[in-house]
Amino acid sequence: MKKIVFLILGLAAFAFGADGEMIRSYSVIAGGIGLGLAALGGAIGMGNTAAATISGTARNPGVGSKLMTTMFIALAMIEAQVIYALVITLIVLYANPMLG
């Protein structure tokens, strides 16, 4: 797996011949990996939040509505982190500050 990653990163420079294009190609790779990791972390966090809410509601059905409200607030905060990663990726891809 490491050999494939190094091969892709090494050949990206030759695939895009110009100097500015090399930075842009690495930005695309980094943006894709970063956004994928952010989405993965967000999905794991949302799954854990939903599991904890369902478990709490099963233990004490009387507080189910309060737990649901808290869960929705937590899900919004988790999703906000993924949206921040998307915004940073879009900035790096379209208004790349490294290109000057």
From Swiss-Prot:
Family affiliation: Belongs to the ATPase C chain family.
Give the location in the cell.
Cell inner membrane
Relate the protein's function as given in its record.
Answer: F(1)F(0) ATP synthase produces ATP from ADP in the presence of a proton or sodium gradient. F-type ATPases consist of two structural domains, F(1) containing the extramembraneous catalytic core and F(0) containing the membrane proton channel, linked together by a central stalk and a peripheral stalk. During catalysis, ATP synthesis in the catalytic domain of F(1) is coupled via a rotary mechanism of the central stalk subunits to proton translocation.
What is the protein named? ATP synthase subunit c
Q: Where is this site: Reversibly protonated during proton transport?
A: 79
Keyword annotations for this protein, in alphabetical order, are:
ATP synthesis, Cell inner membrane, Cell membrane, CF(0), Hydrogen ion transport, Ion transport, Lipid-binding, Membrane, Transmembrane, Transmembrane helix, Transport
Q: Where are the transmembrane segments?
A: 27-47, 72-92
Please indicate if the UniProt record lists Membrane as a keyword: yes
Q: Which CDD domains match?
A: ATP-synt_Fo_c (cd18121)
